[in-house]
Amino acid sequence: MFLLHEYDIFWAFLLISSVIPILAFLISGVLAPTREGPEKLSSYESGIEPIGDAWVQFRIRYYMFALVFVVFDVETVFLYPWAMSFDVLGVSVFLEALIFVLILIVGSVYAWRKGALEWS
């Protein structure tokens, strides 16, 4: 028989971590002042009134840098726990991590050759 009482701490943590943000939003909605005026409805940018049109188009180059950053950030997230338990896991996990790193190296070489890492 499956014992559910072993998961009591998990369910309590899940309930508490769900209730706290909901209560924070509800309390801030009740206690926050709701006065709207021209100052609240105006745009604000770094302490000065914005000049010009608000629709600014970014070059695709910025998105490529962000995408490459996310790929290497995810790589770090996956490799850190592996590195911390490297001595316990064994050779098969080492080979899997090596394949993972090789795939990322191939991807970074591809991005480099396509010019995604060139700033100018």
Swiss-Prot record:
Biological process (GO), any one: photosynthesis, light reaction
Localization: Plastid, Chloroplast thylakoid membrane
S-S pairs: none
Catalysed transformations (reactions): a plastoquinone + NADH + (n+1) H(+)(in) = a plastoquinol + NAD(+) + n H(+)(out); a plastoquinone + NADPH + (n+1) H(+)(in) = a plastoquinol + NADP(+) + n H(+)(out)
Annotated Pfam families: Oxidored_q4
Keyword Ribosomal protein found: no
Gene Ontology molecular functions: NADH dehydrogenase (ubiquinone) activity; quinone binding
PANTHER family: NADH-UBIQUINONE OXIDOREDUCTASE CHAIN 3
Record's protein name: NAD(P)H-quinone oxidoreductase subunit 3, chloroplastic
Species name: Acorus calamus var. americanus (American sweet flag)
Gene label: ndhC
